[in-house]
């Protein structure tokens, strides 16, 4: 009998169930990790509620989940960076189109991770705190460093000042806290938006100026703050974030490119289960209308706006640049914070659906973590 259990979806839109699954074995460039903590993301919930549309390629039964931290229990033949027992955090790529393997989903006891998407963690960093990192970090890095997005310089321990300013709209989110830190580590100034109670967090992470995204005059204020500066572009995170970013860059000098981390319409009100499929239709209509509206707005402002897919760096040089070259030393030397704050909401795989539902209702500057 296998000693591996997983939170499984047996078909598109099916409920989650805990089941015994085969114990995974690593490929040549992979490690197996005994999961100790996982974090939940909106994308995990989206696969369950709208996966037959958003991830039609996914094979079932499926194991979702991306954020995982734990201990290495097996090593592939070509792996050189890890040893048995190493404490690591990694990006579980099982739901990426190029991987599409249940054994590589995070929501199970033993998880297969790609070596180049895995980082060692220092003794001072708990599994629970480390687990907040992978998807937020990967999505931010995809936006900032991929050549077909903002194409910023790589982060390093001693980055030279670039003389450019990045706008991070939604700075206290999982993606935002990582975008702020990565941009600063790459030598860029950062202007962020957040709720006032998160202003101190933004400054701690390195933002040079912070604005309240709910303030009616925020677009004017950010444009004024960018006057005399060269914009490095913007990353838009959260519902309604792309429009103000487009307007701001359209009135500023520099790179008029908005990397969008959030779709044009929310799927939060769509529930899992085939009986709820009709609730998808209004969300799809809103997304189509919102996408057209954003495209027209971007064209008027001579701005490029493009959605980020957070797992694309699995297949290009940005993945190892972040998880292999940058993150290990940045964490070990205290130059990079595991952000946002981890909130432990349960223990065991069966606690994950409750965590996903709580996340749907909204969190602020927090990532929900489940101990495994």
List each model region and its residues.
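Terminal helix/beta-alpha structural elements that buttress the NAD(P)+-binding lobe
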Residues: 2-27, 34-75, 80-372
